[in-house]
Amino acid sequence: MPARNTALRYGYVAQSLHWVIVGLLIVQVTLGTIADDLPLGFEKLVTLARHKSFGITILGLAVIRLAWRWTNPPPPLPPMPRWQHLAANLNHWALYALLFAMPLSGWMMSSASNIPVSWFGFVQLPDLVGPDRAWKGRFLELHHFLAWCLYALAGLHVVAAIKHQFIDRDGLLMRMIPGRPR
């Protein structure tokens, strides 16, 4: 399989970035949910530190994914009604925006809480904002709101892919599945 996208399918670079980010998002939801349920203490702090590290990883991968997309356009969508084409493009760009906004809102929340953010303990990241309890609360609310937006848009993305695979039978889903073209 080629590294670059072709007219018929995504190359292995785009596919790898897509599926690694999907896997990390599942890890993030799990860690975030676990952290919310833990009492304040060592275990919660370790879980949140991992959540932040994976969030920064997703942010870095999103930068790479977007740069790859700009230099390596995706294959064209199969024929479909104009509104579906528009909805697909809006959904993709909204998902990209969330891949940036989610980690940044979490990073700003930590900064406003005066809690340092590091990447797996190797690199300490600078604060994005100064300590401020009110802003910490606002960034927390924003982070949770964006999470619900991500769930909704990712769910729509999955449902649309399944629709194209099993109802439209247009091969759209197979463009992002690793392996031989089908």
Please give the residue ranges for each predicted region:
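Membrane-embedded alpha-helical bundles that constitute the cytochrome b-like, heme-associated redox core
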Residues: M1-R182
